[in-house]
Amino acid sequence: MCYHIFAFIAGFVLDLLIGDPHFIPHPVRLIGSLISFLDKRLNCDAGCNISEKKLNLIKYKRGMRLAFTVIFATFAISVIIIVAAYSINLYAGVIVEAVMTWQILATKCLRVESMRVYDALRTDGVDAGRRAVSMIVGRDTSVLDAAGVTRAAVETIAENTSDGVIAPMLYTAIGGPVLGFVYKAVNTMDSMLGYKNDKYMYFGRFAARLDDVVNFIPARISAYLMIAAAFIGGRHFDGKNAYRIFKRDRFNHASPNSAQTESVCAGALRVQLAGDAVYFGKLVKKKYIGDGLREIEYEDIKRANRLMYITAFLCELLSVAVMSLVLILL
């Protein structure tokens, strides 16, 4: 057990130091390729004259088949890699486990991608900011002003603190890289298939609901850790307001999980997030999160990243403490 804890810590350190260099093939991209492959073959009309209701049911079942196939493949390959590494020797196993843990986490990647938006806004203006933020959000960025670009970046940091950092960290702490990669597979399926349009309304529904389930508890743990981070993070954060806005606005989102950390971040920064947005040319009405006690500014991107990093360190410490306690008790 102690070497699993070492690999867990080493993976987190590697993530902080290296992040996700584009020249290194990332396992999540391979998972995405498998999802795309199955999507093209399963997400199509049944090929016969049937009612719309039956067609939608067929699409839903095919979406389930895709989800279980991706999960099984991810689980099996992860187990094979881990077992093969430890069968060589303990050192090889620990190294491979640490590298896999590193690939599961996205702490530095999230900071790097969001800081590109910050740098673009600060040095080149709103047009450059729109182009930069379009790489990390799904909304139409061409209609955003500087505040809108900043808001989109801060929302992405806040939401992905849970999805990209805390949730995979917790699952890896519980079940090692195998469970961590299974979580990443579910999250990737939701990102690729969880759209409410004609193509994915039924085909992607199972993946979207499964993602809601696996993120339900981690999102709430993330929120409370982020509240703690707001209290200890320094003068730029308002811990009391973070808790107040969390209690009030944590369900102001179509997803049961997304507003958990977004509400904390909005309260901690004393800004207003969310609200209406344009997706694929259509205006989508959304509730606001936060009171907007001050105007949002591009420096809030840096502050949101600081909040995310403190939250990640708190989760790492908590995870290691619990793993160590289990080791002592066993």
Residue ranges and their predicted role:
Residues 1-181, 186, 194-330:
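Hydrophobic alpha-helical transmembrane segments
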